[in-house]
Amino acid sequence: MNDFNYRRRHSSTVQIGNVPLGGDNPIRIQSMTSTSTLDTDASVAQCRRIFDAGADYVRLTAQGVREAHNIGEIRAALHAAGYTKPLVADIHFNPKAAFEAAATTDKVRINPGNFVDAARTFKKLEYTDEEYAAELEKIRRAVVPFLAICREHHTAVRLGVNHGSLSDRIMSRYGDTPAGMVESAMEYLRIFREENFNDVAISIKASNTVIMVETVRRLVAEMDREDMHYPLHLGVTEAGDGEDGRIKSAVGIGTLLAEGIGDTVRVSLSEEPELEIPVALKLVDYITAREGHAPINGCFAKAYNRIAPERRPTNAVGSIGGQNVPVVATALSPADVAAIATKPDFFLSDVNWKAVDASDKSEGFSDDDVLLLTSHHANPVGEIEAFIHRLWDNGCKAPVVVRMSYDDANEEDVQVKAGADFGALLLNGLVDGIVLDAPNLPNNADAVAYSFGILQAARRRTTKTEYISCPSCGRTLYDLQHAVKEIKAATSHLKGLKIGIMGCIVNGPGEMADADYGYVGAAVGKVSLYKGKECVERNVPQDVALTHLIDLIKANGDWTEPKQ
């Protein structure tokens, strides 16, 4: 068995307009508009910007039949201007809108969590097996006519499962779990297969990269068991903006791409949608460049759980390994990092490392060694993983710190590449620390900040405030980008606090399930505020909402004054 070589998962081909997905086609790139779908001119202009940036597909929200119909008008205007790539309608809660969109767009995204099932209320529902089967039959009665319209108009479908919008029915039987997310998709896929409708792709997303990666792996395993090979759409929902959003997306998406999983990618940023495209292109190009590399021999360790990995057991050498959080070390000097807030745990000169290249096949390592592991392979993550799995199977518990170097001078390039590489190693539980060398960055110390950002994005260590912010869409009725910047500026000193900033209620309360506080769009220029899952204040005007949010944080004892 050979577990560490890059090769794409085999998937079936789905025809989406004039840009097919899956099979031997390239990994496709997409984004979503943030304009009102009823504003034809603004939507056309934004679609053009997204396509000009390099997107293969653009998705537009369709809250109702009017919006779904108008996507057809937008499509016609784009075609008249020479833009013929596919448009996708995004549907939640409204099957009638999906029926209309099936006749006006190239693909319709439906959400199994709310296409037939009511919006989630977080209530526990009790079903007998017979009652549960009746609910599935209700889904079939709604889905089959929809598929008939799609078939008539040669319209593809995406089943888009979101962690934040699982139905109460699924939650009651499976819990708020990866298994529940997978079953939410499989219920629909089984109907699609029985109806011989094959132009379907699947996404299964979460804002938590650990859950997102585990769930996609579970879905692939379940589809393999049932001999399904539908193409997969990858994304981390509510990844945020700036450095954090790019790193978090690279950690989640990059980990799966490196395993050969994924046929289309959307990097969700709380920014203008066309800015998502270069990030996605860089990520896909970086991973797919590994194709055809020199073979890496090795197998997963016997104790390794490839679906939901736990951390490799290691010996604690000082504060490295064992039960210690993964460390950040640097080759920079103390003077180089004097100005940054969170200092590295170690300078390379502080520790008696045992430097090893991952191509080394020797086995003479002590449990008291701290291995500083590097790779010069075209697929460095694969070679590093093979080395560590060999250690594991040989019973060696020496902690491993991985050092990787990037020659790029562009900050985004380093964020994407390092996020994908270190993110995979961290999510797979294989490393006890990281060293990120980026000597050509304008500010060398940024490499240390990126290192801590990667650890936090992989849910391995928290060193700053966590923001769960969505990219906005046509459902968002307030200035989300401004709100994100404003909230970050006021709360970024609250280390360890999680704040959700969401455009609307589609995923809002659900994706914020583990957030401490939430700021969710409610109406034009108004938001609702949450403490955990509980809405504590509704319809707050945006111009005073930040003050109300800070007051809420203070009232619950989570506020500290920023240091001057």
Question: Residue locations for each model-derived region?
Answer:
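Catalytic alpha/beta core domains of metabolic enzymes, predominantly
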Residues: 126-143, 148, 171-315, 364-494, ...
